[in-house]
Amino acid sequence: MNRFKSLIILLLLLSVAAGASAQKHGFGAPNLTGYDSKIYHFGFSLGAGTYNYIISTNPDLSTLDGCDSLRVVNPHAGKSFGFGIVSDVRLGKYFDLRFIPSFSFPDCQIQYFCNTDVPNISYANGGANGIVFLDLPLLLKFKSTRMMNNVRAYVVAGAQYSFNLVYSKAKDIANQSAHEVLLVNAHDIMAQVGVGFDFYCTYFKLSTEFKFSLGMMNQLQQEGKYIGAINSLRSKGFQFSITFE
């Protein structure tokens, strides 16, 4: 957790430093004057945030075989971080198309709260426990004109396909375990929307962005006594990222 906090602080410090650098010359000559006329831009992205599930449970848990001890099932948000390569195509004065293949490492838990005579249960998914995503987002970016010469505001929207690179290993662990193991789908499709700022520095452009993602697919894959208490499982996440282009 300390490493995660350190990463968040580092990203914030980098964005503040870049913003200060861009605004230092904000009322003077603009930086990177020929940048916006280029058709293609490339760079890299670093991000951190939270990952969680939206759970739809059985309306009456007591009606399920073997589940009469359950009281409630709750998701518990976990941290997430990732990195990727930025590919940007200029579509017009105010629009860009962005493709940012990335690796992400989300972590989260699903907690089962039982009656007092039955111990509570937690299923963990993430990192070595079962999720390392290859993310393939395709986003449309709408940007404003330059403000103070070296700053732009923008919004992005689009969709992302994600594939769990360690799904086979997680499935083997689930099949060999003597206990129930929560196994989520290897594939996910997420709708995404975000807002951010572009800062034109002396030698590069830095962008800061907040983005929300919502899964469109049911991630629950197998059945079981306690897993059967869940009707559907969809992912959601918030991410703060910085990109260098």
Residue locations for each model-derived region?
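Cleavable N-terminal export/targeting peptides
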Residues: 1-36
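Predominantly the C-terminal beta-signal and adjacent terminal strand-loop region
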Residues: 186-191, 196-245
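Gram-negative (and chloroplast) outer-membrane scaffold detector with strong preference
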Residues: 25-40, 48-54, 86-168, 241-245
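Extracellular/periplasm-exposed beta-strand and loop segments of Gram-negative cell-envelope proteins
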Residues: 52-78, 106-134, 162-188, 218-237
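Interfacial helix-start motif at the membrane-water boundary
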Residues: 79-84
